[in-house]
């Protein structure tokens, strides 16, 4: 039985390859579940992975982050709300939504496949749903390292531009 019940939504006109999103995100969640806080432990989880165009992600970015421009990935974590309301341990714990802009991912996929970029961004989004953030260089390096590990776990090459960032030690500058 899968640990994660994933809903994948295609809300863009771009044709995307059929990738095993359910399997990959389930494997990533299975990998990291032992590290989750005790009150985030559940027998199963739910999440949504939505692929959109730049207009939709720009609207979301404007509405929720007050940034009126497209971005590559947004994550709307539900765990804090779910835990505050209490949850039935017999029911799946809803993690939230990961929204990825396919056109922005395509622009970023210079020197590697769009599929690789989309997998990289989905790993990043899932980490945000699980409480990870990157307000400083050290936490960004930890997050990028985890993303690299997850891509290796599902045999997807790490985007070349990220390899440089992962291998760089965190800056000591403020």
UniProtKB/Swiss-Prot annotation:
GO MF terms listed in the record are: metalloendopeptidase activity; RNA endonuclease activity; zinc ion binding
Q: Where in the cell is it found?
A: Cytoplasm
The organism's superkingdom is given as: Bacteria
Mind telling me which SUPFAM superfamilies this protein's record contains? Answer: Metalloproteases ('zincins'), catalytic domain
> What does the record's cofactor remark say about binding?
Binds 1 zinc ion.
In terms of InterPro entries, this protein maps to: MetalPrtase_cat_dom_sf_prd (IPR023091), YbeY (IPR002036), YbeY_CS (IPR020549)
Would you name any one GO CC term? Answer: cytoplasm
Protein name per its UniProtKB record: Endoribonuclease YbeY
């Amino acid at each position: 039985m899968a640990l994660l019940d994933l809903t994948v939504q295609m809300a863009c006109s771009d044709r995307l390859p059929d990738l095993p999103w359910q399997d990959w995100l389930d494997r990533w969640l299975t990998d990291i579940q032992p590290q989750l806080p005790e009150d985030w432990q559940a027998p199963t989880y739910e999440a949504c992975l939505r692929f959109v165009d730049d207009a939709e992600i720009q609207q979301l970015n404007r509405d929720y982050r007050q940034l009126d421009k497209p971005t590559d990935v947004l994550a709307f974590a539900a765990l804090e709300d779910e835990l505050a309301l209490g949850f039935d341990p017999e029911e799946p714990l809803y993690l939230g939504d990961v929204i990825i802009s396919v056109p922005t991912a395509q622009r970023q996929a210079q020197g590697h496949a769009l599929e690789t970029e989309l997998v990289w961004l989905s790993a990043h989004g899932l980490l945000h749903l699980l409480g990870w953030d990157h307000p400083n260089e050290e936490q960004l390096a930890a997050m990028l390292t985890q993303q690299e590990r997850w891509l290796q776990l599902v045999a997807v090459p790490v985007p070349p531009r990220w390899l440089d960032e992962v291998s760089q030690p965190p800056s000591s500058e403020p």
